[in-house]
Amino acid sequence: AFEAAVAGGIPIIKALREGLTANRIQYIAGIINGTTNYILSEMRERGLDFATALAGAQALGYAEADPTFDIEGVDAAHKLTIMCAIAFGVPMQFDRAYVEGISKLDATDIKYAEDLGYRIKLLGIARRTARGIELRVHPTLIPAKRLIASVEGAMNAVEVHGDAVGATLYYGKGAGAEPTASAVVADLVDVTRLHTADPEHRVPHLAFQPQSLSDTPVLPIEEVTSGYYLRLRVADVTGVLADVTRLLADAGISIDAMLQREAEQIAGDGQTDVVIITHET
């Protein structure tokens, strides 16, 4: 009975709780906040800075007068916590989630990411690993060829991987009167149906009976392995690039891709940007 709380009109809760019941869910990755996705789309497509894109979202009613919960990733983390509980059979642990929003993103980073073949989206990611569960919301570079990277505007999408079905993608409106009403009616029907069954044979709201919940730990972000995006503003002098790569190598960090801009394209003050994407570390 949480359909209206997550991803608007997308029936992702029923998919996780019932449609994919034969699967051991491996991970979930979702664009689950329409406000931030709209802002990022405007920054990429029109080259707007964050403040201008946010003002546009507020003018259209996509963002609240106080947009903190949206732009700082809190709303997405709430939704991700519900999906994680249903997918992995763990208690809701919002306080253990790593949450980072988009307010510090620069249009320059969005352009560099695109030059390297990526798009930046605010993703909610829940992943089952041998050591525990990853539960995190943050800006993420997604290869542009992936379907979820093409989700623009205020739309939502959730990618779910199961061991039997493989990759599945759920796409639709994440907010609005009619999509939300559709989800609310689904919740009401679900609750009514549950009350016609005896407690022992009901499908629990969170898919698992309380006594069956796992105590699998949520991993702190320091224990999560991932590739990273780095943008370094450096002096445009001979040997700087070699110094940067040597420092990364000394730290055991491997470079996957690198991009360097001419100094005159940056500030004309003898500085340049070096953009690096690392391998998982």
Predicted features along the sequence, with ranges:
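Glycine-rich phosphate/pyrophosphate-binding beta-alpha loops
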Residues: G166-T168, G172-E178
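A conserved regulatory-domain signal marking ACT and ACT-like small-molecule sensing domains
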Residues: A183, L188-T281
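Predominant activation on well-ordered alpha-helical scaffold segments within soluble catalytic domains
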Residues: I13-R17, N37-S41, A51-Q58, A77-A85, ...
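Low-complexity, glycine/alanine/valine/leucine- and proline-rich hydrophobic stretches
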Residues: H138-D163, A177-E178, T245, A249-D269
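Substrate-binding/catalytic subdomain of NAD(P)-dependent oxidoreductase enzymes
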Residues: T52-S150, M155-A157, G176
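Rossmann-like NAD(P)H-binding beta-loop-alpha module
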Residues: F2-A63, D70-D75, I82
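Short helix-capping/linker segments at secondary-structure and domain boundaries
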Residues: R46-D49, A87-F94, T192-A197
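Structured core elements
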Residues: Y27, I39, K121-L122, R136, ...
